Regions:
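N-terminal active-site segment of His-dependent metallophosphoesterases
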Residues: 1-40, 165
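Extended active-site neighborhood of metal-dependent phosphoesterases/phosphodiesterases
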Residues: 30-153, 168-190, 196-220
Length: 220
């Protein structure tokens, strides 16, 4: 899509807000991920696109379903090559603070693709998702969120939304089925996600979490 225009716009905005880091909500390489750490897409779709001075900050990354069509281990391994790209594991966490304030933020990055029940029936996903361990990830999420206390913001980042006003309603239902109770029990403040190719802010009644969807920025 229009990645060059998006990269230029992000650089213009970053000159004003001077971000300390940037978050990707997955589908990092459209349409089929990357093949290896030497895939030319690293250059053509990342390094040469997001090259502005103010974009030379850590990029905190999560995986999307299109990344699963390629080599997800290569995206993890690229963390050892790039000083910006940060994806140490399919699911991971990061503690941040806002400069010159007492505000602390806990980010929990999760891998939502294995929680999409219908992917286990689709040829382009079933072989790779069947090798994942959703129980292990759920256990990790429970333990991780359970340890969070005395922070100003408890934020989770994933790819698939739980709620949407868009067309991917079925996908959202699977995410909600597997994860919403964990968010409720652990008072997650915000869930950043993508998948839908638009921007949405949803706050379901009787739930604490604000859902912020930002997917396919180059299309928006």
């Amino acid at each position: 899509f229009n990645q060059a225009a998006l990269g230029a716009t992000m650089n213009q905005i970053s000159m004003v807000i001077e971000p300390e880091f940037i978050i990707s909500t997955g589908d990092n390489f459209y349409d089929s991920g990357v093949a290896s750490v030497n895939d030319p897409l690293w250059t053509y779709s990342f390094e040469q696109i997001y090259k502005g001075n103010f974009l030379q900050v850590p990029w905190y990354v999560t995986l999307g379903n299109h990344d699963y069509r390629g080599n997800i281990q290569a995206q993890i391994d690229y963390s050892d090559i790039s000083r910006r790209w940060t994806l140490p594991a399919p699911y991971w966490y990061k503690t941040e603070s806002i400069d010159d304030t007492d505000v602390s933020i806990e980010f929990t990055f999760i891998d939502t693709t294995p929680f999409q029940d219908d992917y286990y029936k689709k040829a382009k996903y079933k072989d790779v998702v069947s090798k994942t361990d959703t129980l292990a990830q759920k256990k990790w999420i429970i333990e991780r969120l359970g340890k969070i206390s005395d922070v100003n913001w408890n934020i989770v980042v994933g790819h698939h939304p739980m709620y949407t006003g868009g067309k991917r309603v079925n996908d959202a239902s699977y995410t909600r089925k597997h994860l919403e109770s964990l968010f409720d029990e652990n008072y997650v403040d915000v869930y950043f996600c993508g998948h839908e190719h638009d921007l949405q802010h949803i706050k379901p009644e009787n739930h604490n979490t604000h859902h912020l969807i930002s997917g396919a920025g180059s299309e928006v």
